[in-house]
Amino acid sequence: MRSDDPAAAHVQELIDGFWPIHVLTALTQLELPEALASGPAAARDLAQRLGLDEFQLFRLLRAGSALGVCQDLGDRRFALTDAGALLRRDAEGSLRGDVLFYSGMSKGGFADIPEIVRTGRAGHSVTLGPEGFDRLGEDTDRLDDMHRTMVGSSRDVAIDLCRIYDFSAHRTVVDAGGGYGGLLAAVLQSCTHLTGSVFDLPSVERGALAYLKGQGLAGRAGFVPGSFFDGPPPPADCYLLKYIIHDWDDSRARQILASCRDGMGADGVLLLIDRLLPGRFAATPDHRRFARADLTMMGYGGQERSEREMFTLLHSAGLRPIRIVGHAWTLSVVEVRAA
């Protein structure tokens, strides 16, 4: 490659982006962030403790140092950086689940893109279909990893949500499809006049109740088991629907929205928290994030939607978008009422 060719350099930079996720995945799966949590250690000691090959472990930790998640101290000794600490399962704001999720996508969903584009069928759609969520509930470790990850991201979303949306007119809130209730907990802690519940599959109930109790909300927050496809969420003044619709194609998404419409009543409000894609894409950091998110959902049979696409979907489900509160890569909130 010619060093003075900016077009070639740009493509090479894109090509070189393939390997970091695999390093992070290896570090995470081998539980090296946990092993280094108590302080620096030699590759030899880590290898003996974890039953690993010393030389290959040294090479992996060296690669982790190049990525900034480990620190090479010399003499084959390594420490964990602040970034690497986020790969620990018990870290505040842990990104362990994100690493494992996108690692799976790099081996499956993204690799399937050519076939999906040829056929229009998502190879992993069963994973996020109703049967797939039931199957996920049988894998307790994977289920716990996923929902712990969602708790962290949900709390970040809730901070922004409570800043831009006034909940004073509401008394009850349902976090529909809310997992362990990270979003609900943060909203209730910010708006102390509210009570609420999580509506999700029965497999989530134990983890959700434990999390809500741990947040000091046992008296104000509960759990209602159920599925959008079997009936509406329990009645409430306000439904929260965060990053749910993008999991599904239009037909299933319409069913979910119609289920919410049936449960919310004439005076109820639905806050649809999702990404709204730009009308046109350009080579910018935010647009790359939008594209990554959309192709991720492509692999699972879902999709991100533009404002026009989302509004069309809402109207088809008997709902009326009132306004967009906040509009950014991380947070777009559409306030919705029954039509």
What are these regions (language model features)?
Residues 2, 8-29, 34-40, 48-49, ...:
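Conserved Class I S-adenosyl-L-methionine-dependent methyltransferase catalytic core
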Residues 1-72, 167-168, 172-339:
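Alpha-helical subdomain
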